[in-house]
């Protein structure tokens, strides 16, 4: 599809489309089907060259593939991105220099040197870690050396650096750490099992057996002494893995987040055997087998609420777990549905409202974020009734939650605009729709400072490498015009970095000097451009249209 004066698919025909029939403003669209619909409306009266049914109804290959995902190579001089292969479901990876020149498809052994999206950087900005094909890699940014930390059929995820160079990552609910020169070691293990060292429940018969039969008593004392000695050796030996932490048999581990220094673990659990409700079954009649098949869908609305969560703070060295109660959250006992319950003649709510620690938007892990120095942690707690969202910290010394922000809405808390994290100096930043629009706030322990304001939205905030500037997506001109914007962490004017009229997403270069932008328009599938972080004209890197 050409943006202006080119080939446009129109109601089953292909021909140049008059610009006066086109919408006057660009629209942010990620769906080519939606673009085709708009084009059909604009050009329905024009008909010359027939289009095949495949082109008109489904397959956008004839238009050209959109850039689906893009990231920086380690040196900041090249970008890597994925394109759909024509006529197939395969996604190929290409590499292109930003200084000019064509793209090269990376195939075969060349793929072993690929970088990956969502890389995380150490405090000195000399190394980055990322996950590729489920394995963890570390790249030295001084010379490009790539070190593979894991090579397994399991999926590792969520790497994070500590301020002193320790890297932690997870494999399911097991946590590992890596430090240069020491290799990979297990950092924390939590099990939903009975602690073998825990005393059994009181039982008169058992007590009489031990009191009357000296052999049984001696055997028990021998076992206990051997176990205690082994645990003492484990704690004193730095080459040993940490002992498991046992949460008991009444819970199921749903998620967890380890502090970068490996000392603390936050664990999210649900009740074992809890009824999630029967899921709906969607019948599929056109199948390879020739027989009808059923696909499991979500639990039907109104059947069962999402399972409530419990939260535990684990001292990894001591293998001790303490439940963090939610009763310190303001409004947790208030029932926003009290009037409806009364009208329906239902019993009033008793105790605290059920809550969940929801996953991050990208599905990478729970909405729990540690600061790089492991001194601070924040988590997003959401009421199951969707009327409240809290961002809470944890008092690690006293094992209790401390509320940092509360957002309440009688209608519904948005599933989006819930990003949060920490600045370089340990202040909490977060998005909130308290004003009616998503805006950026910073809280350093007192009253929150609002960095952005107006009848527009902030999304996907990212800190610059020096920690001085937030970059984010904004739509200040009108709701459909998305750009990359920036604002100082200390406060100040918001500036627009791009003028592309349709930013989909962006990524800062490793040194923070440039921004890789994926953008589209009504008649152009997502493409890549690069712009200086200080602003200026964008340099377009790709044009995948035919």
Regions from the PLM with identified roles:
Residues 45-505, 513-514, 520-526, 531:
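Beta-propeller folds
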Residues 312, 540-546:
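N-terminal cap/lid segment of alpha/beta-hydrolase-fold proteins
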Residues 528, 538-541:
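Blade-level signature of beta-propeller repeat domains, shared across WD40, Kelch, NHL, RCC1
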């Amino acid at each position: 599809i050409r943006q202006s004066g080119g080939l446009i698919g129109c109601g089953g025909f292909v021909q140049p489309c008059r610009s006066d029939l086109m919408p006057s403003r660009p629209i942010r669209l990620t769906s080519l089907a939606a673009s085709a619909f708009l084009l059909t409306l604009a050009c329905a009266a024009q008909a010359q060259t027939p289009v095949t049914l495949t082109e008109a109804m489904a397959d956008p290959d004839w238009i050209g593939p959109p850039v689906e995902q893009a990231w920086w190579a380690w040196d900041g001089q090249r970008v890597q991105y994925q394109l759909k292969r024509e006529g197939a479901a395969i996604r190929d990876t290409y590499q292109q220099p930003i200084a000019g020149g064509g793209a090269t498809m990376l195939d075969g052994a060349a793929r072993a040197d690929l970088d990956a999206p969502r890389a995380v950087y150490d405090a000195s900005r000399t190394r980055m870690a990322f996950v590729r094909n489920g394995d963890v890699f570390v790249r030295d940014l001084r010379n490009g050396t790539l070190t593979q930390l894991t090579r397994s059929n399991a999926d590792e995820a969520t790497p994070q650096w500590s301020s002193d160079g320790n890297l932690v990552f997870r494999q399911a609910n097991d946590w590992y750490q890596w430090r240069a020169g020491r290799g990979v070691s297990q950092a924390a293990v939590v099990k939903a099992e009975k602690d073998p060292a825990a005393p059994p429940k009181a039982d008169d018969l058992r007590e009489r057996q031990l009191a009357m039969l000296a052999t049984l008593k001696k055997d028990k004392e021998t076992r206990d002494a051997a176990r205690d000695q082994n645990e003492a050796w484990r704690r004193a030996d730095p080459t040993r893995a940490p002992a498991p932490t046992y949460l008991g048999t009444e819970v199921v581990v749903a998620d967890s987040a380890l502090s970068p220094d490996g000392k603390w673990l936050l664990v999210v659990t649900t009740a074992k055997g809890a009824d999630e409700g029967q899921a709906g079954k969607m019948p599929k009649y056109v199948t390879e087998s020739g027989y009808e098949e059923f696909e499991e869908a979500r639990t039907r609305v109104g059947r069962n609420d999402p399972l409530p969560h419990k939260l535990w703070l684990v001292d990894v060295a001591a293998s001790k777990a303490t439940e963090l109660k939610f009763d310190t959250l303001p409004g947790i006992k208030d029932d926003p549905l009290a009037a409806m319950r009364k009208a329906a003649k239902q019993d009033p709510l008793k105790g605290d409202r059920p809550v969940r620690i929801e996953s991050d938007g990208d599905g990478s892990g729970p909405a729990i974020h540690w600061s790089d120095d492991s001194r601070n942690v924040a988590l997003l707690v959401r009421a199951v009734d969707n009327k409240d969202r809290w961002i809470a910290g944890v008092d690690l010394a006293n094992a209790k939650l401390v509320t940092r922000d509360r957002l309440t809405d009688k209608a519904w808390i948005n599933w989006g605009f819930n990003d949060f994290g920490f600045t370089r100096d340990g202040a909490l930043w977060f998005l909130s729709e308290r004003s009616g629009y998503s805006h950026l706030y910073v809280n350093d322990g007192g009253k929150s400072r609002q960095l952005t304001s107006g009848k527009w939205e902030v999304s996907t905030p990212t800190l610059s490498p020096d920690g001085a500037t937030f970059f984010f997506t904004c739509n200040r001109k009108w709701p459909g015009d998305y750009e990359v914007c920036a604002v100082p962490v200390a406060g100040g004017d918001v500036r627009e970095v791009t003028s592309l009229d349709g930013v989909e997403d962006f990524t800062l270069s490793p040194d923070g000097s440039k921004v890789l932008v994926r953008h589209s328009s009504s008649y152009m599938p997502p493409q890549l451009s690069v712009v200086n972080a200080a602003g200026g004209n964008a340099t377009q890197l790709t044009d995948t249209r035919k």
